[in-house]
Amino acid sequence: MMRLPFAIKADQRGAALIELALAAPFFAALVIGMVDMSRAYSMKLKLEQSAQRAIEKVQASATKPTDFTYVGTEATTAATAAGYSGSTATVDYWLECNGTKTAETTGAPLSPSNCSDGETYARYVSVTVSNTYTPLFASRAWPGANAQGQIPISGYAGVRVQ
């Protein structure tokens, strides 16, 4: 009768299965986390490519445009084509005098006369495309997540236009 507990204690069969059962949830959480991070990073890259596409339109224009609203439309169209409908694009256009940002607008022409005589001036256009990423397991515990568990993601591109 006393031999049965010793026999069970010495038996090693099934130990690996129990260890796997203890470790499997950890490994599953690790894989799900990696998949979530890679999907979020992929979304960021596609939004950035959408912003780059809009900047390419600015670079391709032969004239100096004074209205850049078409850039935002191009960026949202490119983001929708990439599979991210509901994206918003913000277009910034500003003038720098001697490397200092002096004025910002959403498309009105900025005259170099805003700079003092002898100052170097430059005009810039930038596009930011934004959307929200919903993880596989949405939670407010994720860094930067909103109340719905979604994480805001954006892509940025800019160019000097003069």
PLM regions and their residue ranges:
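Generic N-terminal initiation segments characterized by hydrophobic and/or small/turn-forming residues
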Residues: M1-R3, L17, D92, G107, ...
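Short, intrinsically disordered, low-complexity terminal/loop segments
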Residues: M1-M2, R123, R160-Q162
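Transmembrane beta-barrel outer-membrane domains
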Residues: A21, T120-A122, Q148
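Low-complexity, S/T/G/P-rich flexible repeat/linker segments used as non-globular hinges
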Residues: S130-Q162
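Alpha-helical assembly-interface signal, strongest on the long, hydrophobic N-terminal helix that forms
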Residues: M2-A79
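A generic fold-level signal
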Residues: Q12, Y121-A122, P152
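Short amphipathic secondary-structure patches
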Residues: Q49, A54-T128
